[in-house]
């Protein structure tokens, strides 16, 4: 723990943590979907690897989601609206909005969630593990 003065009072907070994606374990969820996760107390980030044709079935969660496409393209459906998000583009999905996605090509995306996805950390995410 590190202690510092903030607004006239002493505050303690954990030491920062440093990661390298290459050192993170890749979790295989299905034949077409894998991920690496880094989680803090209030936010988390995941590299998600989707093979062309991979399907993320419709689901929703408490977390606000920001998806940044590093390689490839995903077709999302949110509230009946279809949008293709490609390399270099970002999609923000508000909390509790049902959404699904299909990988139009081999894709690597960076998903940021706040608050953290406890279902992912507990591996209680069957909707992904049974995905195509």
What are these regions (language model features)?
Residues 2-42, 46, 125-132:
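A short, N-terminal "cap"/entry segment at the start of jelly-roll beta-barrel domains
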């Amino acid at each position: 723990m590190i202690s510092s003065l903030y607004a006239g009072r002493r505050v303690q907070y954990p030491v920062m943590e440093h990661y390298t994606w290459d050192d993170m374990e890749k979790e295989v969820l299905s034949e077409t979907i894998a991920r690496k996760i880094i989680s803090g107390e209030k936010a988390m980030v995941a590299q998600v690897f989707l093979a062309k044709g991979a399907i993320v079935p419709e689901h929703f969660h408490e977390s606000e989601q920001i998806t940044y496409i590093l390689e490839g393209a995903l077709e999302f459906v949110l509230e009946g609206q279809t949008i293709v998000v490609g390399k270099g583009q970002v999609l923000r999905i508000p909390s509790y909005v049902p959404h699904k996605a299909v990988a139009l090509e081999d894709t690597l995306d960076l998903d940021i969630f706040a608050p953290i996805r406890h279902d992912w950390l507990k591996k209680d995410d069957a909707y992904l593990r049974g995905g195509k």
